[in-house]
C-alpha cells in the first residue's frame, strides 16, 4: 500500500497533523545533595491505587508523572508542566527530582533500594520478580514513554482513500504495525539526537557486571540498559505474529506474563495486551526517550514536534526489507549509535541525510511549513554531535562530573518551582484562585478537564463522581438562586434584615438625576455610594464626612459606570473584615487594609505606588495574591480629600490611603485574623450565610470593636455585603498572618472520599 500517495490526497491533507499525545515520565527523588532519597512516597499525593497523574514506578523513590491525553503536543506539555509544579512543591523540602535518566549514586546494598509500597499485592510481587530476574539497579533508570495516536479522523480519511483493506479497525492496525517496524528500524536517530545517559554513577554497575566503555550516548538505550533476556524474540511482521510470540514466551517460561515483554515500542489497545485482537492497535508507546537534563520537564517542545513529524515520516516512508530483517538491522544500528562516544561523528551520516531530506520533502508535499524549522534544527546536529543532548552533557561532565550536572540542574529546577508558589505552571493565565484549586486537585488525584479556560470552568472526576466548578468555588452545593441573591445588594440586605441582622440603611436609584437630587440628604453625613450588583469592590466610593455636590456627582458617575442602579447607604464606622464561610464553618477571616503607600519624604505618591507595585506578590486579574495599586479616578478623588495629588511628596512614615474601600482586588493589603476575632462574630457570619441559603460565601462585617462580643440583634457589627464567588487566593497567601488553604476545603466539600 502506498501510504505516501494516500497522505497527499486532497481529502487527507487537512487531517495529517491531527494526533493525540500523552506522556509518562519517571524521576528518582533525591536529596538536594544528590543522594537517593530514603523517604516513602509522600502521603500528600493521596492513594497511588487511583492517582491519574502521580504514581511510583519500580521503586518507592521513583515518581512517575502521567499526563492526560491531549490533542496537541503543546497542551500535553502544558499539563506536564503543571504536574511538575505539584510534584516539586509537594515532596519534602530537602528533596528534588533527579533530572537524569541514570540514577544518583545508589546504596551499596540492594536491600536498601526499596520496592514501591503499593496497595495491590500482585503489583508488589511483580516488582520483586523483576528485581530478582533483572536486578534492582537496572530498574532504577528513568526515562520518558511517549504515547502517540494518529487522530481517528486522519485514519478514517486514509482508509476511505484506499481499497485494499475492507475494515477500518484492521486498516488502523496495519498502519501502526508498519509504523512500529519503521520506528524500530530508524530509532537510532532518536537515540542519537535525544540519548542522554552517557555515564553512570559509582555502584550502578557491580564489579562482576559487563559494562560499557563510558562515555556513550545512551546507556539506557543500549544492551546495558533495561531489556529482556536475549532468548526473548518477538516478530513485528503482523499483530498476530507479535501476540503469538509473546504468548509462546509466557507459555515456555521465558516471560512471567505478557507485560514483562519490554521493547522500545509498545503496541497499545485495551488495558491488557490480550485485548489487542479485539480492540486492534489504538496507539503506540515510544519508550526510548532519555530525560533531557537541560529542560525542567525532561523534554522540550521542539522534541515533541520533531517526534510528531517523525511519526508522519514513518508512515510516509516505505520498508525496504522483510519485516524481521528490517527490525534486526535497526537493532544493530541503534546499538552502534547508543554505545558511540557523544562527541564522535556517527557512521550513519548517509542514512541520516536521507531521512532528513525525505522528511523535509514530506513536509513540503503536505504543506507543513512550520515543521521545516524544527526538522532543520535537528538536521544540523547530524554533523555536530556536540550539539546533541548527550554531546552537551559530556562537555559539562568533562569539566565537572555527572553528579554535579544532576545536582546543578535538579536544584535549579526545584528552586524555580518556588519562585511564584501561588501560580501553577502551564495555567498561569487563569485566575489565581483557580490555579491554586487546580494545584490541589492534581495533588489529590482528581481527574481534571478544563471545559472553558476563559470562564474558569472545570470538570472534576473521581470514579463515577463528577463535579463542575467555576471560578474555583462556584459549585453544585449552592443552588442557582443563591448567587443571584448575593449579586443584588438590595435583595441581600432585605433578606438579612428580615432575618434580624444589622445592615446599613439607604436608598436605591436607577436614575442618575434622581440620585443626584438626593445629595442634600447626605451632604453632611457619612455615606457610601456603590453599584447595586457588582463584585470585587468595583465602583464604590466612601465619604466619611459628607461630600460636595461635585464629588457626590463624580461618585455617582463611577458607580453608574458599573451598573444600571446604585445604592446610597449610611456609612457604618468600624473595621471591615471578610469572613469566608464554607459549609456552616468560618474557614478564614481577613482584615483588608485599603490601598496605601507610606511616605519617605523624598518620593511622590506616584513613585511610591510604582515601588510598591514592584513586589512580586502583586499582579493583575487575580493572578497574584495582591493586586497592583491603580491611580485612576477613584484614587485621585481619594487623594483630593486628603489635600494631595499623585505628584505630592508625603512626609516620612505618613500613610496615604488611595482607596476608602479595603478590597484586595483594588490594591489593598490582606492580613489574616482568623485566630484573633471572637467566636461570637464567627457565629453571626455563619447564621447570616445560612439565611442567604449559601454553602460558600464571603461575607463582609463592619466591627467597631472586635474585643466586644457580638450579638445578632445589636450594633456591635453591621453586614455590608455578601459575595457568591469570594476570592480565595488572598486567604491562601495573605500579606501578613497565617495562610488558609481554602481551595483544599472546597475540594473536601466536593470530594470527602478523596480529601481527608
Curated annotation (Swiss-Prot):
Report the enzyme's class at the first EC level: ligase
Residues reported to bind Mn(2+) 1 = 700, 721
Which Pfam families does the UniProt entry name for this protein?
Answer: ATP-grasp_3, ATP-grasp_6, Glu_cys_ligase
GO cellular component assignments: cytosol
Gene3D superfamilies assigned: 3.30.590.20, ATP-grasp fold, B domain
* ATP-grasp domain location: 493-751
| Pathway the protein takes part in | Sulfur metabolism; glutathione biosynthesis; glutathione from L-cysteine and L-glutamate: step 1/2; Sulfur metabolism; glutathione biosynthesis; glutathione from L-cysteine and L-glutamate: step 2/2
| Record: residues binding Mg(2+) 2 | 721, 723
Q: Which GO terms describe its molecular function?
A: ATP binding; glutamate-cysteine ligase activity; glutathione synthase activity; metal ion binding
Instruction: Show the catalytic activity.
Output: L-cysteine + L-glutamate + ATP = gamma-L-glutamyl-L-cysteine + ADP + phosphate + H(+); gamma-L-glutamyl-L-cysteine + glycine + ATP = glutathione + ADP + phosphate + H(+)
Q: Can you tell me which residues bind Mg(2+) 1?
A: 700, 721
Keyword terms: ATP-binding, Glutathione biosynthesis, Ligase, Magnesium, Manganese, Metal-binding, Multifunctional enzyme, Nucleotide-binding
Catalytic activity, EC = 6.3.2.2, 6.3.2.3
Q: What does this protein do?
A: Synthesizes glutathione from L-glutamate and L-cysteine via gamma-L-glutamyl-L-cysteine.
Q: How does it assemble?
A: Monomer.
Which family does the entry's similarity section mention?
In the N-terminal section; belongs to the glutamate--cysteine ligase type 1 family. Type 2 subfamily.
Full protein name: Glutathione biosynthesis bifunctional protein GshAB
For this protein's source organism, the top of the classification is: Bacteria, Bacillati, Bacillota, Bacilli, Lactobacillales
Amino acid at each position: 500500500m502506498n501510504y505516501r500517495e494516500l497522505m497527499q490526497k486532497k481529502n487527507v491533507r487537512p487531517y495529517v497533523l491531527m494526533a493525540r499525545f500523552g506522556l509518562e515520565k519517571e524521576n528518582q527523588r533525591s536529596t538536594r545533595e544528590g543522594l537517593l532519597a530514603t523517604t516513602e512516597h509522600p502521603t500528600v499525593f493521596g492513594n497511588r491505587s487511583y492517582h491519574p497523574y502521580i504514581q511510583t514506578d519500580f521503586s518507592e523513590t521513583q515518581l512517575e508523572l502521567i499526563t492526560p491525553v491531549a490533542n496537541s503536543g503543546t497542551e500535553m506539555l502544558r499539563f506536564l508542566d503543571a504536574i511538575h509544579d505539584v510534584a516539586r512543591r509537594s515532596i519534602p523540602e530537602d528533596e528534588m527530582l533527579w533530572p537524569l535518566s541514570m540514577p544518583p549514586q545508589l546504596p551499596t546494598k540492594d536491600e536498601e533500594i526499596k520496592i514501591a509500597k503499593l496497595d495491590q499485592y500482585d503489583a508488589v510481587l511483580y516488582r520483586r520478580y523483576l528485581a530478582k530476574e533483572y536486578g534492582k539497579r537496572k530498574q532504577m533508570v528513568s526515562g520518558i514513554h511517549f504515547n502517540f495516536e494518529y487522530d481517528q479522523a486522519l485514519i478514517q480519511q486514509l482508509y476511505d482513500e484506499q481499497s485494499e483493506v475492507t475494515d477500518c479497525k484492521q486498516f488502523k492496525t496495519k498502519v501502526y504495525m508498519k509504523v512500529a517496524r519503521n520506528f524500530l528500524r530508524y530509532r537510532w536517530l532518536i537515540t542519537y539526537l535525544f540519548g542522554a545517559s552517557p555515564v553512570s554513577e559509582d555502584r550502578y554497575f557491580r564489579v562482576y557486571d559487563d559494562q560499557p566503555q563510558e562515555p556513550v550516548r545512551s546507556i539506557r538505550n543500549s544492551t546495558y540498559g533495561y531489556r529482556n533476556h536475549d532468548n526473548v524474540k518477538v516478530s513485528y511482521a503482523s499483530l498476530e505474529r507479535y501476540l503469538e510470540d509473546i504468548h509462546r514466551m509466557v507459555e515456555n517460561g521465558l516471560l512471567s506474563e505478557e507485560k514483562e515483554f519490554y521493547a522500545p515500542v509498545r503496541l497499545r489497545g485495551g488495558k491488557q495486551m490480550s485485548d489487542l485482537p479485539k480492540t486492534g492497535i489504538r496507539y503506540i508507546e515510544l519508550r526510548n526517550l532519555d530525560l533531557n537534563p537541560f529542560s525542567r520537564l525532561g523534554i522540550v517542545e521542539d522534541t515533541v514536534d520533531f517526534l510528531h513529524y517523525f511519526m508522519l515520516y514513518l508512515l510516509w516512508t516505505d520498508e525496504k526489507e522483510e519485516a524481521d530483517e528490517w527490525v534486526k538491522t535497526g537493532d544493530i544500528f541503534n546499538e552502534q549509535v547508543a554505545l558511540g562516544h557523544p562527541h564522535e561523528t556517527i557512521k550513519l551520516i548517509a542514512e541520516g541525510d536521507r531521512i532528513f531530506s525525505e522528511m523535509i520533502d514530506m513536509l513540503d508535499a503536505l504543506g507543513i511549513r512550520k515543521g521545516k524549522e524544527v526538522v532543520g534544527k535537528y538536521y544540523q546536529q547530524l554533523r555536530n554531535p556536540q550539539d546533541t543532548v548527550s554531546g552537551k552533557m559530556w562537555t559539562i561532565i568533562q569539566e565537572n562530573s555527572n553528579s554535579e550536572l544532576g545536582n546543578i540542574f535538579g536544584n535549579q529546577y526545584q528552586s524555580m518551582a518556588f519562585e511564584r508558589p501561588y501560580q501553577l505552571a502551564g495555567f498561569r493565565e487563569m485566575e489565581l484562585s483557580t490555579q491554586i484549586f487546580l494545584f490541589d486537585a492534581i495533588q489529590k488525584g482528581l481527574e481534571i478537564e478544563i471545559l472553558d479556560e476563559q470562564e474558569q470552568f472545570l470538570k472534576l472526576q473521581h470514579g463515577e463522581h463528577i463535579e463542575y466548578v467555576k471560578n474555583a468555588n462556584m459549585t453544585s452545593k449552592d443552588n442557582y438562586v443563591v448567587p443571584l441573591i448575593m449579586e443584588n445588594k438590595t435583595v441581600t440586605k432585605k433578606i438579612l434584615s428580615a432575618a434580624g441582622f444589622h445592615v446599613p440603611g439607604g436608598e436605591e436609584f436607577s436614575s442618575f438625576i434622581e440620585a443626584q437630587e438626593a445629595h442634600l440628604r447626605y451632604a453632611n453625613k457619612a455615606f457610601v455610594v456603590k453599584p447595586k450588583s457588582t463584585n470585587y469592590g468595583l465602583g464604590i466610593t466612601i465619604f466619611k464626612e459628607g461630600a460636595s455636590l461635585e464629588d457626590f456627582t463624580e461618585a455617582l458617575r463611577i458607580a453608574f459606570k458599573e451598573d444600571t442602579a446604585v445604592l446610597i447607604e449610611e456609612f457604618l464606622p468600624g473595621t471591615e473584615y471578610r469572613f469566608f464561610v464554607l459549609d456552616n464553618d468560618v474557614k478564614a477571616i481577613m482584615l483588608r487594609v485599603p490601598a496605601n503607600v507610606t511616605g519617605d519624604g523624598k518620593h511622590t505618591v506616584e513613585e511610591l505606588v510604582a515601588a510598591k507595585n514592584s513586589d512580586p506578590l502583586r499582579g493583575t486579574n487575580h493572578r497574584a495574591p495582591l493586586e497592583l495599586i491603580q491611580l485612576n479616578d477613584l484614587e485621585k478623588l481619594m487623594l483630593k480629600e486628603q489635600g494631595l495629588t499623585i505628584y505630592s511628596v508625603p512626609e516620612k512614615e505618613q500613610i496615604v490611603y488611595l482607596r476608602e474601600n479595603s478590597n484586595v482586588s483594588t490594591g489593598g493589603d490582606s492580613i489574616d485574623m482568623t485566630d484573633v476575632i471572637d467566636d461570637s462574630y464567627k457565629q453571626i457570619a455563619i447564621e447570616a450565610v445560612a439565611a442567604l441559603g449559601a454553602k460558600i460565601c464571603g461575607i463582609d462585617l463592619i466591627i467597631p470593636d472586635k474585643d466586644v462580643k457580638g450579638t445578632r440583634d445589636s450594633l456591635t457589627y453591621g453586614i455590608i455585603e455578601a459575595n457568591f464567588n469570594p476570592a480565595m487566593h488572598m486567604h491562601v497567601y495573605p500579606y501578613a498572618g497565617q495562610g488558609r488553604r481554602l481551595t483544599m476545603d472546597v475540594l473536601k466539600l466536593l470530594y470527602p472520599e478523596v480529601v481527608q
